[in-house]
Amino acid sequence: MTAKIQKILSDLGYGSRRFIECMIKCGKISINGEKAIIGQYLNKKNPGEILIDKKKIIVKRNKNLPKVLIYNKPIGEVCTRDDFQKRLTVFDKLPKLNLNRWVSVGRLDINTKGLLLFTNDGTLANKLMHPRSQIEREYNIRIFGEMNKNKINILRKGVKIIHGYVSFKEIVPLYDKKEGKNKWFKGILCEGKNREIRLMFKSIQCQVNQLIRVRYGNIILPKNLKEGQWMMLNSIFLKKLYNLINFDKEIINKKKN
């Protein structure tokens, strides 16, 4: 049985398919001594010698349960695996895996905090991130600037930013959270583009000065999970997550050995 190289490496936990495509374009992946090609088909059981950044990878399937964890990202951490500026990354505090690597389900910019999901199942990560899945991302947003019903309606209908036209699925004031001239809102999106929320508010002359992701799909950030801490999802929540994308994963119904 064959599969595309980006799917094979994604399933092994080496990043999302898009990330792997970028590495291939940059010439960082080789197969049997030759540069890999995007969309190249390989034998899933015996794909040959694969090098990533000149390091040989072990193509060994993880026979254990798929793993997903919640990480409460603090401000100041970046979502890259290796940062050339040597800043703290969200991967630094995660538990080590024996056979593969953690894949982040989307990203949060350095000044955003809150819920990040990580998994060792590249297919799950890809489906949760893909715009076609329409997975909700919920944020608590603190803004500085004048807000009114007209501006809220503009954000609901859609504004043009560098990524194109974007809109909130839901945007409502949080009246129980007020801090002087700052105002809090709950915002829900079904996509995750770079600095999207900040740019949306900037387009209506408001500044986002605090942004917290509190929910991704049906996974809510636990109130007792402190910043910089992680928590592994149990089999019940794993099943809910797979059901969210209509993805039948028989292995989650099996008991861990």
Curated annotation (Swiss-Prot):
One of its GO terms (biological process) is enzyme-directed rRNA pseudouridine synthesis. Residues 3-63 form the S4 RNA-binding domain. The active site is at D109. The keyword Isomerase applies. It holds the Pfam family PseudoU_synth_2. Keywords: Isomerase, RNA-binding, rRNA processing. It catalyses: uridine(2605) in 23S rRNA = pseudouridine(2605) in 23S rRNA. SUPFAM superfamilies: Alpha-L RNA-binding motif, Pseudouridine synthase. The keyword Cell membrane does not apply. Its EC number is 5.4.99.22. GO terms for molecular function: 23S rRNA pseudouridine(2605) synthase activity; RNA binding. It is an enzyme of class 5 (isomerase). Belongs to the pseudouridine synthase RsuA family. Responsible for synthesis of pseudouridine from uracil-2605 in 23S ribosomal RNA. This is Ribosomal large subunit pseudouridine synthase B. The gene is rluB.
